[in-house]
Amino acid sequence: VCHSMAHKLGAYHHLPHGVANALLICHVMRFNAAEVPAKMGTFSQYQYPHTLERYAECAHFCGVCGKDDAETLELFIQKIEQLKEAVGIKKTIKDYGVDEQYFLETLDQMVEDAFDDQCTGCNPRYPLLSEIKEMYLKAYYGE
């Protein structure tokens, strides 16, 4: 869903695709890691939520370890945020000069378009429209 949302963020607000993905990735990782998602992904290999476990495995490969998978994920996200800062990625969509009024005017259509994007169906957790909207708002304003 990160890629789907980044497609629309770039299309509506002219942000480079890599920047759009970077602005969204940590919000999407937290969303995907929910142990009790509202709706699972559509592919059969996702019989139960295991995204948190997979993120923790990725973190371990990068030398990041916490006392459990949830702490490991948060430490991993901190490392990703540090990397983003080191390469000059700003903290929020707003920091890139995206006008707040225009962002809010386009938000509902971006949400719908991201939901319908071909990449969304591959996400391990299938998002509700309200959940996509919440992630966009977090990425715009910061948490």
What is each of the regions a protein language model found here?
Residues 102-143:
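Short, amphipathic C-terminal "tail helix"
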Residues 1-21, 116-122:
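Glycine-rich phosphate/pyrophosphate-binding beta-alpha loops
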Residues 4-5, 71, 94-97, 124-130:
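Short coil/turn segments at secondary-structure boundaries
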Residues 15, 19-102:
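Gly/Pro-rich interdomain helix-loop hinge
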Residues 5, 25-29, 80, 84, ...:
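Short alpha-helical scaffolding segments that buttress acidic/His motifs in well-ordered protein cores
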Residues 1, 5, 20-24, 54, ...:
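Residue-level detector of well-ordered alpha-helical segments, enriched
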